[in-house]
Amino acid sequence: MSLRHEQLPQDVEQLSRMVLDLRAEVAYLKRLIHGARSEVLSTIDPTQTSLDLGDLSTVPVAANDDQPDGSRQSVRGRQSAARNIGFLPKHLPRYDVIIEPESRACACCSGALHRIGETTSEALDIVPAILRVKRTIRPRYACRACENGVMQAPAPARFMDGGMATTALAAHIVVSKFAWHLPLYRQAQIFAGYGITLDRGTLGIWGTRVAWWLKPLYDRLLAFIRSQPRVFSDETRLPRLDPGRKRTKVCQLWAQAVDDRPWKGPAPPAVGYIFSESRSAREAERQLASFNGVLQVDGYTAYKTLARHRGKSNSSPLRLAFCLAHARRKFVDVVKLTGSPEALEIVSILAEVYQIEREIRGQSAEDRQNARQLRSAPVMRQLKARLLDLKNDISTQSALAKAIKYTLAHWTGLNAFLDDGTIEVDSNIVERSMKSVALTRKNSMFVGNVQGGETFAVLASLINSAKLSGLDPYAWLADVLERIVSGSTTINQLETLLPWNWKADQVGQAA
């Protein structure tokens, strides 16, 4: 909202604060559009008030969200480059190239040489993908003694009537897009390099058909996730074409995930995506109607509305656990934009919490809870006291004040992890699952229609859940798709094909 000259405050100090706040807001918006979003901080001079960050030291003092286990490093040193040192993996097949000397005769006496040993070296080799045509031949047999004795084996099931792709090729196309983020137009270019023209529209039709076959398995995946006592949830945009308009319509891809590995719980890791045209609280209620337990989320209003409605209706209980990383990120932004020593102090306090989390990761839920009560709870009390002190001393319109207001407004949910060792300190588990979606979306740009969005959700859910289970996504999908299409696995046996139950009996061990 713009202010007229006569509406501006007369106090010079207040005007200066407004200018600094506006400059910080502009810098923040520019960084959202053009800048990196890493949360690695540099040491900042507490006396610095300028937005010029060019003189910052390079010693990190806070962490980002990119640790594989969701933990943070309070101090990050220079890491050596990762290299393959030693022997190549034993599970890779070997082939031998034997190089004999030009002559096996002794150079001194011309006598025959005998083998006394060998020198072996290994080098990694690759055999590029080979396209081939699978010919299915069904001989017909007839009886010479009668006219009605013709016999022929029935035609095998095909994953698509009239299609010219095998289940293996269809699996390759799907995995290339959703696991390795190769858009269909690039895959079409790769196939052209092999000498065959495949339109990307054809590839898309094959992917849609794969999703059709896998839909019952996807439904079981979502049912499993929602049956757990703790679920992480998040959402991200997924543009789709909107005929008649000059721009795409912004739809949503919701994610729900489970992962008990931080406390060695029984549930296998899994993630399910749901395509929707809405981001409303009603949509959240529709998706989570059957869920009751702990829902770990960011501060999005729809989740708070959902929990409030559940509380009023006395229906299945829902407890919200909020993400401490989201609260911390707001203070990190303030430090980066204004160099605020107060914000840096808050980040440093939060770093203590994450250091404790790093140390207790992998312990039992009981041990985690005890450690949190003993060590983390005092830190969180210290944090709240400091936030309340700062709240009374700074401009209510400043970026720091807004970060403090957000944190205090979500305080109960941010402390949920203290009383339950099975609750995580943040929702980074589900946020990491969004990185794969973001890469696929960046390369593919949009989905063509609602069916395309639903196909995206089905395939991304199963492929990423397979990766979370440590499987080779292609080996899993090719085998599962063939079993479903051929009918060797019935509808009542689909549970055995979920990634954590799958046995690679026919295709070798999973990666």
Swiss-Prot record:
Pfam families: DDE_Tnp_IS66, DDE_Tnp_IS66_C, LZ_Tnp_IS66, zf-IS66. Residues 59-79 are annotated as: Disordered. Keywords: Plasmid. InterPro entries: IS66_C (IPR039552), P-loop_NTPase (IPR027417), Transposase-related (IPR052344), Transposase_IS66_central (IPR004291), Transposase_TnpC_homeodom (IPR024463), Znf_dom_IS66 (IPR024474). Belongs to the transposase 25 family. This is Uncharacterized protein y4jD. It comes from Sinorhizobium fredii (strain NBRC 101917 / NGR234). The lineage of its organism: Bacteria, Pseudomonadati, Pseudomonadota, Alphaproteobacteria, Hyphomicrobiales.
